[in-house]
């Protein structure tokens, strides 16, 4: 459950390969605006899609949406969207303060350990997944991306909620 929320935060649409490491890129204002322009169409295209069985027709339509919004390819869109999502997942909606991904994972571990409502077997499994994720999660490589996403937060937050990978809940 917690791990899937972390994964959902890193992956914006089902067309992206599950559990792949985010290729960190330096975001531009043009990419943010392109993402904003493409997000609703992408969410609509991938609604109900099976991520394990990509549909070539849907992928072609998604590539056209990406190109229409200034991306060289669907992969280019995916890289930008994953970087945006990774940062959005670390922003507290109330304070607008950013927490690096490793610190987010450490907090999830601490919260889960203290959560009495989660059955022990489930807790043990989720803690193992979070511990494994902690070994691989990396801080944001391009710190200027944080400021760029924060600048556009009010445009991005509703799009994240629509796609099901909204900003993390307030503490």
Regions found by a protein language model. Name each.
Residues 7:
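C-terminal active-site/capping subdomain that shapes the small-molecule cofactor and substrate pocket
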Residues 10-12:
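Membrane-interface helical sensory segment of bacterial ECF anti-sigma factor regulators
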Residues 63-129, 135-141, 148, 152:
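Mature extracellular/secreted ectodomains of secretory-pathway proteins
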Residues 14-16:
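N-terminal signal peptide c-region/cleavage motif recognized by signal peptidases
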Residues 1-4:
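Bacterial N-terminal signal peptides that target proteins for export
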Residues 18-64, 143-150, 154-171:
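Immediate post-signal-peptide N-terminus of mature secreted/exported proteins
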């Amino acid at each position: 459950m917690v791990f899937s929320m972390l994964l959902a935060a890193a992956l914006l649409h089902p067309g992206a390969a599950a559990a792949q490491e985010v290729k960190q890129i330096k975001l531009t204002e043009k990419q943010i605006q392109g993402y904003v322009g493409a997000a609703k169409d992408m969410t609509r295209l991938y609604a109900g899609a099976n991520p394990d069985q990509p549909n070539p027709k849907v992928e072609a339509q998604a590539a056209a949406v990406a190109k229409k919004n200034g991306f060289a390819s669907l992969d280019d869109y995916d890289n930008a969207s994953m970087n945006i999502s990774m940062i959005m997942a670390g922003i507290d909606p109330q304070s607008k303060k950013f927490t690096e991904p490793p610190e987010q994972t450490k907090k999830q571990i601490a919260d889960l350990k203290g959560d009495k409502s989660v059955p022990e077997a489930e807790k043990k499994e989720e803690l193992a997944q979070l511990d494994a994720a902690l070994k691989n999660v990396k801080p944001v490589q391009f710190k200027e991306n944080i400021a760029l996403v924060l600048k556009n937060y009010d445009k991005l937050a509703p799009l994240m909620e629509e796609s099901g990978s909204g900003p993390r809940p307030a503490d």
